[in-house]
């Protein structure tokens, strides 16, 4: 191709050089060209590709080295696209045309798909197989020379017709044997027949069936005869039974008179085991169909109907209209039945005397998973608790009023005053029964209005519990049962009870603020402590933020840090709150600094001597420093710690109260170790406590024996925990990383460097791995590109096919419309 001149001149020059544009003028020069049509077409394609610069694509190299040719720098995307399109049309296009077609011609001839066999070998094997198939077909060929129609024997063998049956007259009949032998039965020789009969001739189906029937009848007759024989023997034994019994009775009497002891028969283990199985089967209760599982609404309706029926019977008995002595459904059974309906079981049972842990009375412990069980409380057995006191005086009921009878039905109260009127005259043990019956009769499934009634009743029940906690004496068993019902109602109506709890907390905070100004206002009171415990029993305490628990815990923490300690009873109340905090945080393990401060202050106040330099950094206001001499232990070696009641703190001797408070403090320290052991600041938290305990160990002669042992065990536990925390603590360090090389300005030269290498890693294994990864990546990309091209090709083919169908349909409809337009309606 010439490089000078225009594009048109260069094109003409290329055509002239390829002898494509010359045409002879005279006839002599019109000789037949030796070039074929394909050669001329190839030349045209070459000229077209050379002059079409848009059909070529060049890859610009980053570093161009003169005289160095690299494959892949120049490409022809149009040509490649055309080749790929043609290849897909031959492969994928053919498959698309064959889809949804089941018919095909499959060449199953021998060796057709085996390229290793020659044509002669294929033909020879096919011929041999054809001969084998033909020989099998001719095995029963009727066109053979020998006629073998009678028992596979030729007719020439049957040379005599004087066999039995052929000499009979026309009037005579053929017997079965003649028919069997001669009428297509074999035409066998008589000698052979005689031999077969001697050995055992072939029997017909009729003969076989006759023999089977005869044998069956024979066996049946034998069984019947044996059965009759057994019946006769049994009848004989029955007739002789009376004689045997009389003989045995006479023998027993004679042996008893003579003093002879009869030996009992020896029963083997197998017989004894068999007898036991038989007895179990005899006395085993037969299975009966059970009733279907009832819904909650049906159970509530059944229980409500039962209570109404019992109430009607009670009223009838009171009015002397009915005397039914069989109806004795007492309040205790009724309470158990209603508890089973709502899943209460036995309710919150009172804790055992050995399971009480400290000043926490554990009255409101529920089975909620967020609350803490009483067996995992944080104070030892010999600790303070709110001991159960009998409910006396006008705290609950009027002294002058007569004792009222317990009814079976009660209306749902709308106010606390109305609820108190319902309980008037009843014993405090019947209060949970009344609440249970109110909940049963006004179940939410029985009436649409019961939901609002029970929601209001839950608030009334909370008000009544708070009313009971303000009484001088209160039964812990009563609070347990009422708390159980309140917990169940809180699951149904959390919003209403949450608002009520928040209002109570707001009133507490106001009284707490007033107690800072007016010393005559005491906070916390016993009712406040019981309310704190009630909150932890009703609501989850492990949540980080809770609409009810969070304000309550803030109030408790403020009371621990700000409330004054004017007496040992105030110190005991603070330890009670600290115990509740540890119980609340037993699951979440959140650190509460007020708890550690309260424990440290209690240790400081009870120390026998004045401490000039207080170990640690816990908060110690001046008011406590002034009262240290008032609360200091003098000599309590004879005062063993015991369980205390919050109602009797003011009445106990000082030494006994000091001993019990110190024992409680040591238990709280041990429980705090278990909760806060994983804290990062565990060492800093408990080192001041360990220092205080070491000071107490110097004065252990002033303590009782049990208290001294508890002090040493607690000190050992604290010191061991601190040592373990020190061993687990790792000092701060910079982030570890591989050493970095010092940067150098000297250029790096590699021997054997080549531009063909894509990687210059000196590690051959890593280089090979990177090479395989690169190959896998390239192959994956190529496969994805191929799949996308195939998908586009299939889409184009389907569009073309659909376009052709639409065009054919439109053409057909157009022809029909033309015919209808020229159609004469008269015809």
From Swiss-Prot:
Residues 1-24 have a biased composition (Polar residues). Keywords: Nucleus, Phosphoprotein, Ribosome biogenesis, rRNA processing. Residues 350-372 have a biased composition (Acidic residues). It is found in: Nucleus, Nucleolus. It comes from the Eukaryota. One of its GO terms (cellular component) is nucleolus. Belongs to the NOP14 family. Component of the ribosomal small subunit (SSU) processome. This is Probable nucleolar complex protein 14. It comes from Schizosaccharomyces pombe (strain 972 / ATCC 24843) (Fission yeast). The lineage of its organism: Eukaryota, Fungi, Dikarya, Ascomycota, Taphrinomycotina. The gene is nop14.
């Amino acid at each position: 191709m010439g490089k000078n001149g225009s594009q048109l001149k260069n094109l003409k020059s290329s055509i002239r050089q390829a002898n494509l544009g010359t045409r002879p003028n005279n006839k002599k020069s019109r000789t037949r060209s030796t070039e074929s049509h394909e050669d001329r077409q190839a030349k045209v394609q070459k000229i077209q590709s050379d002059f079409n610069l848009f059909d070529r694509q060049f890859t610009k190299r980053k570093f161009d080295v003169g005289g160095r040719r690299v494959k892949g720098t120049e490409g022809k995307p149009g040509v490649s696209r055309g080749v790929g399109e043609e290849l897909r049309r031959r492969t994928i296009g053919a498959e698309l045309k064959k889809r949804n077609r089941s018919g095909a011609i499959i060449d199953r001839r021998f060796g057709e798909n085996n390229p290793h066999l020659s044509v002669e070998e294929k033909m020879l094997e096919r011929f041999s197989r054809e001969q084998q198939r033909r020989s099998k077909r001719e095995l029963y060929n009727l066109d053979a020379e020998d006629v073998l129609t009678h028992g596979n024997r030729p007719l020439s063998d049957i040379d005599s017709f004087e066999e039995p049956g052929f000499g009979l007259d026309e009037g005579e009949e053929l017997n079965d044997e003649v028919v069997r032998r001669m009428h297509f039965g074999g035409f066998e020789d008589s000698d052979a027949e005689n031999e077969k009969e001697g050995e055992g001739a072939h029997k017909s189906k009729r003969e076989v069936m006759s023999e089977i029937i005869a044998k069956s009848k024979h066996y049946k007759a034998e069984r019947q005869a044996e059965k009759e024989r057994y019946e006769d023997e049994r009848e004989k034994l029955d007739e002789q039974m009376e004689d045997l019994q009389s003989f045995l009775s006479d023998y027993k009497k004679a042996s008893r008179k003579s003093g002879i002891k009869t030996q009992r028969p020896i029963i083997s283990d197998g017989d004894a085991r068999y007898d036991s199985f038989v007895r179990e089967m005899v006395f085993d209760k037969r299975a009966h169909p059970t009733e279907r599982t009832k819904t909650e609404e049906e159970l509530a309706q059944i229980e409500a109907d039962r209570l109404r029926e019992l109430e009607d019977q009670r009223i009838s008995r009171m009015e002397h209209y009915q005397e039914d002595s069989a109806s004795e459904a007492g309040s205790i059974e009724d309470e158990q039945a209603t508890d089973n309906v709502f899943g209460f079981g036995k309710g919150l049972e009172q804790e055992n005397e050995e399971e009480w842990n400290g000043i926490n009375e554990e009255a409101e412990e529920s089975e909620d998973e967020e609350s803490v069980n009483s067996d995992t409380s944080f104070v030892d057995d010999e600790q303070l608790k709110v001991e159960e006191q009998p409910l006396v005086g006008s705290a609950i009921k009027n002294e002058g009023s007569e004792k009222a009878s317990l009814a079976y039905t009660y209306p749902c109260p709308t106010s606390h005053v109305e609820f108190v009127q319902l309980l008037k005259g009843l014993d405090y043990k019947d209060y949970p029964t009344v609440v249970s019956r109110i909940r049963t009769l006004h179940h939410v499934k029985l009436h649409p209005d019961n939901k609002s009634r029970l929601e209001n009743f839950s608030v009334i029940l909370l008000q009544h519990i708070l009313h009971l906690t303000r009484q001088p004496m209160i039964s812990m068993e009563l609070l347990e049962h009422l708390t159980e019902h309140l917990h169940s109602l809180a699951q149904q109506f959390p919003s209403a009870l949450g608002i009520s709890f928040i209002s109570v907390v707001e009133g507490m905070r106001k009284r707490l603020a007033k107690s800072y100004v007016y010393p005559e206002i005491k906070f916390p009171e016993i009712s406040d402590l019981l309310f704190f415990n009630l909150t932890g029993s009703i609501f989850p305490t492990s949540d980080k933020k809770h609409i009810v628990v969070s304000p309550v815990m803030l109030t408790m923490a403020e009371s621990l840090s700000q409330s004054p300690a004017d007496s040992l009873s105030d110190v005991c109340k603070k330890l009670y709150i600290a115990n509740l905090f540890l119980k609340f945080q037993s699951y979440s393990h959140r650190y509460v600094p007020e708890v550690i401060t309260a424990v440290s202050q209690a240790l400081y106040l009870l120390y026998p001597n004045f401490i000039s330099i207080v170990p640690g950094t816990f908060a110690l206001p001046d008011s406590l420093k002034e009262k240290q001499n008032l609360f200091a232990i003098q000599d309590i070696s004879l005062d063993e710690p015991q369980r205390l009641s919050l109602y009797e703190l003011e009445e106990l001797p000082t030494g006994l109260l000091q001993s019990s408070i110190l024992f409680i403090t040591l238990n709280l320290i041990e429980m705090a170790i278990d909760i806060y052991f994983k804290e990062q600041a565990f060492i800093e938290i408990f080192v001041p406590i360990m220092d205080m305990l070491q000071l107490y160990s110097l004065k252990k002669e002033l303590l009782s024996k049990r208290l001294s042992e508890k002090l040493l065990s607690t000190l050992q536990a604290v010191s061991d925990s601190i040592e373990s925390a020190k061993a687990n603590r790792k000092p701060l360090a910079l982030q570890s990383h591989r050493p970095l090389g010092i940067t150098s300005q000297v250029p790096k030269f590699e021997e054997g460097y080549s531009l063909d290498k894509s990687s210059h890693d000196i590690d051959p294994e890593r280089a090979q791995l990177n090479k395989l990864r690169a190959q896998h990546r390239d192959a994956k990309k190529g496969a994805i590109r191929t799949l996308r091209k195939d998908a586009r090709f299939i889409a184009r083919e389907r569009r073309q096919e659909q376009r052709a169908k639409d065009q054919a349909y439109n053409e057909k409809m157009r022809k029909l419309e033309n015919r209808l337009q020229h159609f004469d309606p008269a015809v």
